[in-house]
């Protein structure tokens, strides 16, 4: 059996960070939304016993058992007693270690594909398995935009209208940010100044005034070049611009698709003119995660009968 799906990237429209807990994690209140861009994940399940294999064309450093997608497949096999060989192929489009949830989304995509292949419908068991793999993975199993609390495992649906975004990812290795470092910098800033951990409050209705990220200030303090990227977005017409997750990707919210497209072109032009090493992505938030579909060959996908059957009903 061969299944394919999109592993969407995400942004955090809101990220509020509470104090560090006894287990070393922080309590969070975050609003995450999936995007219409992401990785293409192709999962093949053999009829024979065998290992899990994971390949990422063009990114050999992401091959192998340490990839979150491969770890998700192994965890699924252990939990549900599966010994079939599983081959995973990921066409990587979401930047890596960017605050966009790419690896977590790939892992969730594999879980969704395997759940369909083996007819696993126990959502609670899948959610628990997802949390073992990573804090963001449960979100990518859910229906769409959601408020997440705790480590990210307590999810409640959120009504977020489609938003047109421009994402700017600095590919310069000196601007890379490990998630653990971002939270440590926030803890250090709070310990050394008047900024106390905020009261997280309860999830509410989304409104633009909520846009914000507690990790942004300490990350910008350590990586001042991020402030220039935020300025590029505002200068190109964004109504607001913030960092996503633990960064270093920043994004701007624009009043429409045309405005976002024009801004993306302008920022790309600026990048060619001197702000080298940035990747500019045009995206829109979506209300649902993508479905898992049977793989179809390019020939069958382009046939008249397939085109008719693939139309929404």
Swiss-Prot record:
Its EC number is 2.7.1.148. The active site is at residues 10, 136. ATP binds at residues 95-105. One of its GO terms (molecular function) is 4-(cytidine 5'-diphospho)-2-C-methyl-D-erythritol kinase activity. Pathway: Isoprenoid biosynthesis; isopentenyl diphosphate biosynthesis via DXP pathway; isopentenyl diphosphate from 1-deoxy-D-xylulose 5-phosphate: step 3/6. It holds the Pfam family GHMP_kinases_N. Residues 292-307 have a biased composition (Low complexity). Signal peptide: none annotated. It catalyses: 4-CDP-2-C-methyl-D-erythritol + ATP = 4-CDP-2-C-methyl-D-erythritol 2-phosphate + ADP + H(+). It is an enzyme of class 2 (transferase). The keyword Kinase applies. Residues 289-313 are annotated as: Disordered. Keywords: ATP-binding, Isoprene biosynthesis, Kinase, Nucleotide-binding, Transferase. One of its GO terms (biological process) is terpenoid biosynthetic process. InterPro entries: GHMP_kinase_C_dom (IPR013750), GHMP_kinase_C_sf (IPR036554), GHMP_kinase_N_dom (IPR006204), IspE (IPR004424), Ribosomal_Su5_D2-typ_SF (IPR020568), Ribsml_uS5_D2-typ_fold_subgr (IPR014721). HAMAP family: IspE (MF_00061). Catalyzes the phosphorylation of the position 2 hydroxy group of 4-diphosphocytidyl-2C-methyl-D-erythritol. PANTHER family: 4-DIPHOSPHOCYTIDYL-2-C-METHYL-D-ERYTHRITOL KINASE, CHLOROPLASTIC (PTHR43527:SF2). Belongs to the GHMP kinase family. IspE subfamily. This is 4-diphosphocytidyl-2-C-methyl-D-erythritol kinase. The gene is ispE.
